[in-house]
């Protein structure tokens, strides 16, 4: 039977059988409403609160800001490739000149004592480290010596051997911080979070000095897990002391070699590692592309595992809420619809979206007006919006109990430090309004306002910005590898701390400056950053957008 005939048969089967047992979400991507239709209320599980209006700080649920990925012209793309080619050619020349002794450069030579050691990097990785990364190493790995709030103190350092080693004169520089994931501004050295975290040390100390299964977890962590489940509107939750391990070490507990993982193209490294460790078959769909996802789902059901020619026992879709390098928001309603249609499971990583998205900070599930029970595995981290460390997995009690018994990171690792658990508990309570104030709601609203203002101003100034206007992650494309060093150094010289990203973290032609907006930022601070970026963009001719005319006469309010 031909592939086309199989697909047609599958369509008939799905329409006659699966649709009888499942219903498709009413909230769909870019859903249109009739003029005479009354505005519908979207039900969201909020514990004691049953419903919320379909209109919030982001506008109507059915009219969310789309993800934008403006492309550059071919000529600029060719120029970027030529820049990389020139970089590699001169790097090879430098390697040969140094190797044959024409130029003395002891800093990049291997120590004779290390000749018998196993290489840490492949040949290309070592070559790239020696000749490309080392030239701009000074804009990365900058040590900080203060709380990473709206401003942060950077330790000054100088290098006399091409960034191989550093000297520290003992001074520091205070900069506007647009590089940390401090979305809601809870990274503070004073206030209720810091005070209650400090008091928890007196009660419970700094560590339990054991694993969860030997002596158990702290009272603070037990309280936190109950609060996380209440906050998300699910049955249960489990917390871990490391966010990266929450993904990488728990995925193998959910799937095995008889399962299929369908992963978004731009998923985080922790998810990719988890997929590899699980032993499951893995297929990648194009970023946020529902047609690509459905095509893989259809083929997986129609043909099964190509190695065994048997049906997969389980199909798990893995996506993120906000993608940290793209600034885009996942199309959750579309993904849930396909998940239900094809009887798959859904794993949602809300590391960057929990606390930062939604009317009450409950992530992209609330942002889209979806039911949290439609997501099988809700994952998130506490390193961003909560100003702490660690991660969580939430969902049904059966799933969480399975992880408590089978997860290596829960079984062998130490439980969460009590002051960290208390920091998360206090900040989450503020977000939920349990402190009796509106501080949490005001932080969420201020973050949304800051993010929209900053993004729109960059677009108005002629820069290409990826992602959604509602996202606090703002990637500004600069493309050329040399631009990363230029922006990193010039921004620091003007007392602004930002993150520049290039290959291998991104594609070779998509170098970028990534701004992370915070509720702690004032309009004056954002304007100062925008003024500096605009100046550097003019100096380096990195205003590549062809759509700036669409925003020229638009009044952008804060």
UniProtKB/Swiss-Prot annotation:
EC number in record: 2.3.1.50
CDD domains: KBL_like
PROSITE patterns, per the entry: AA_TRANSFER_CLASS_2 (PS00599)
InterPro entries linked to this entry: Aminotrans_II_pyridoxalP_BS, Aminotransferase_I/II_large, AON_synthase_class-II, PyrdxlP-dep_Trfase, PyrdxlP-dep_Trfase_major, PyrdxlP-dep_Trfase_small
Keyword Oxidoreductase listed: no
GO molecular function: pyridoxal phosphate binding; serine C-palmitoyltransferase activity
Catalytic activity: L-serine + hexadecanoyl-CoA + H(+) = 3-oxosphinganine + CO2 + CoA
Class of enzymatic activity (EC top level): transferase
Modified residues (N6-(pyridoxal phosphate)lysine): 384
Needed co-factor(s): pyridoxal 5'-phosphate
Pathway stated in the Swiss-Prot or TrEMBL entry: Lipid metabolism; sphingolipid metabolism
Family note: Belongs to the class-II pyridoxal-phosphate-dependent aminotransferase family.
UniProt name for this protein: Serine palmitoyltransferase 2
């Amino acid at each position: 039977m031909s592939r086309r005939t199989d697909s047609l048969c599958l369509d008939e089967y799905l329409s006659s059988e699966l649709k009888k047992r499942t219903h498709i979400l009413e909230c769909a991507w870019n859903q249109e409403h009739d003029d005479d239709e009354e505005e519908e209320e979207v039900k969201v599980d909020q514990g004691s609160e049953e419903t919320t209006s379909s209109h919030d700080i982001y506008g109507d649920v059915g009219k969310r800001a789309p993800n934008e990925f403006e492309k550059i012209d071919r000529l600029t793309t060719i120029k970027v490739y030529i820049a990389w080619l020139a970089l590699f050619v001169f790097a090879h020349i430098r390697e040969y000149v140094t190797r044959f002794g024409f130029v003395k450069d002891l800093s990049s030579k291997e120590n004779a004592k290390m000749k018998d050691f196993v290489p840490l990097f492949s040949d290309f990785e070592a070559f790239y480290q020696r000749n490309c990364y080392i030239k701009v190493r000074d804009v990365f790995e900058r040590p900080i010596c203060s709380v990473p709030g709206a401003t942060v103190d950077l330790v000054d350092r100088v290098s006399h051997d091409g960034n191989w080693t550093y000297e520290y004169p003992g001074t520091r520089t205070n900069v506007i911080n647009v590089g940390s994931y401090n979305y809601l501004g809870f990274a503070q050295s004073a206030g209720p979070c810091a005070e209650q975290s400090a008091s928890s040390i007196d009660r419970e100390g700094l560590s339990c000095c054991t694993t969860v299964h030997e002596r158990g977890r702290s009272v603070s962590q037990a309280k936190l897990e109950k609060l996380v489940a209440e906050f998300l509107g699910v049955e249960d939750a489990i917390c871990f002391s490391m966010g990266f391990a929450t993904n990488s070490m728990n995925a193998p507990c959910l799937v095995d070699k008889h399962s299929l993982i369908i992963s978004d193209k731009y998923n985080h490294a922790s998810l990719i590692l988890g997929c590899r460790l699980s032993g499951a078959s893995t297929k990648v769909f194009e970023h946020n592309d529902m047609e690509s996802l459905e095509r893989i789902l259809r083929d997986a059901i129609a043909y099964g595992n190509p190695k065994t020619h048997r049906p997969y026992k389980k199909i798990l879709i893995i996506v993120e809420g906000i993608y940290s390098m793209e600034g885009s928001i996942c199309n959750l309603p579309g993904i849930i619809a396909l998940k239900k249609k094809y009887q798959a499971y859904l794993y949602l990583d809300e590391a960057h979206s929990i606390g930062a998205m939604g009317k009450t900070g409950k992530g992209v599930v609330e942002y889209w007006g979806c039911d949290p029970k439609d997501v099988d595995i809700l994952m998130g981290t506490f390193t961003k919006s909560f100003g702490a460390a660690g991660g969580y997995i939430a969902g049904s009690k059966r799933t969480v109990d399975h992880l408590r018994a089978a997860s290596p990171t829960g079984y062998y690792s130490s439980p969460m430090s009590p002051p960290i658990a208390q920091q998360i508990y206090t900040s989450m309570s503020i977000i939920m309004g349990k402190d009796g104030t509106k501080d949490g709601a005001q932080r969420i609203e201020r973050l949304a306002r800051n993010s929209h203002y900053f993004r729109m101003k960059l677009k108005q100034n002629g820069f290409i910005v990826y992602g959604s206007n509602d996202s606090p992650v703002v990637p500004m494309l600069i493309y050329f590898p040399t631009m990363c060093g230029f922006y990193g150094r010039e921004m620091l010289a003007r007392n602004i701390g930002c993150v520049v990203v290039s290959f291998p973290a991104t594609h070779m032609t998509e170098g970028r400056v990534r701004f992370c907006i915070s509720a702690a930022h004032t309009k004056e601070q954002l304007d100062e950053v925008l003024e500096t970026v605009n100046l550097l963009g003019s100096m380096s001719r990195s205003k590549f957008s062809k759509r700036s005319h669409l925003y020229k006469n638009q009044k952008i309010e804060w």
